[in-house]
From Swiss-Prot:
Pathway: Amino-acid biosynthesis; L-leucine biosynthesis; L-leucine from 3-methyl-2-oxobutanoate: step 2/4
A single GO cellular-component term on record: 3-isopropylmalate dehydratase complex
SS bond list: none
EC numbers on record: 4.2.1.33
Gene Ontology terms: biological process: L-leucine biosynthetic process
Organism: Mycobacterium sp. (strain JLS)
InterPro entries named in the record: 3-IsopropMal_deHydase_ssu (IPR004431), Aconitase/3IPM_dehydase_swvl (IPR015928), AconitaseA/IPMdHydase_ssu_swvl (IPR000573), IPMI_Swivel (IPR033940), LeuD (IPR050075)
Similarity section: Belongs to the LeuD family. LeuD type 1 subfamily.
Gene: leuD
Protein name stated in the entry: 3-isopropylmalate dehydratase small subunit
Catalytic activity: (2R,3S)-3-isopropylmalate = (2S)-2-isopropylmalate
Signal peptide: none
GO molecular function: 3-isopropylmalate dehydratase activity
Enzyme class label: lyase
Entry annotated with the keyword Lyase: yes
Length: 197
């Protein structure tokens, strides 16, 4: 997983609340067994509407999604995070995230930046007044800069550390590879064991 320090990209105002994982990517798009190729399913039902924000330039090139409260509710669907990332999003800003979505996002490298709802409204206003506005999100300092406005965001320390280090679950496990190998060597021969690679 690529480490996340800062990201600057076009802000996309998604003025919707209670966006669940089925709206992010409908179940019909979940037939792949890989982690890539889900961008076509992102907001598929809404993208049929020509006036949907992702169909409008410059928002179609955005990488910082600014959404209403309760983003990512519904079923635990890693595909929702993968679809956002495949489309090009690196950050989702909202005043409230579903716990499962927040966890899946951090494990995959997508920053879920939680801000006050008044700050979401302010960022929406700035983006709509200046389409194409670039937003900079700094994970180290935990702030968002949109135009001349800077707002803080929250994220738990553990997820922030994983993102800063670029550690997904496999990366975390590989940090302990020598200890795992030592443990396997010491296990009694009558116990099940993994085969060497």
């Amino acid at each position: 997983m690529e480490a996340f320090r800062t990201h600057t990209g076009i802000g996309v105002p998604l003025r919707r609340s209670n966006v669940d994982t089925d709206q992010i990517i409908p179940a019909v798009y979940l037939k792949r067994v890989t982690r890539t190729g889900f961008e076509d399913g992102l907001f598929a039902a809404w993208r049929n509407d020509p006036s949907f924000v992702l169909n409008l330039p410059p928002f179609d090139r955005g990488s910082v999604l600014v959404a209403g409260p309760d983003f990512g509710t519904g079923s635990s669907r890693e595909h929702a995070v993968w679809a956002l990332m495949d489309y090009g999003f690196r950050v989702v800003i909202s005043s409230r995230f579903a716990d499962i979505f927040r966890g899946n996002a951090g494990k995959a490298g997508l920053l879920a930046a939680e801000v006050n709802q008044n700050d979401v409204e302010l960022i929406w206003k700035l983006i709509e007044q200046n389409p194409g506005l670039e937003i900079t999100v700094n994970l180290q300092d935990r702030n968002i800069i949109a135009g001349t406005v800077m707002v803080p965001f929250t994220i738990d320390d553990y997820t922030a550390w994983r993102l800063l280090e670029g550690l997904d679950d496999i990366g975390l496990t590989l940090r302990k590879q020598s200890e795992i190998e030592d443990y396997e060597r010491r296990r009694p021969s009558w116990k099940p064991r993994t085969l060497p690679v």
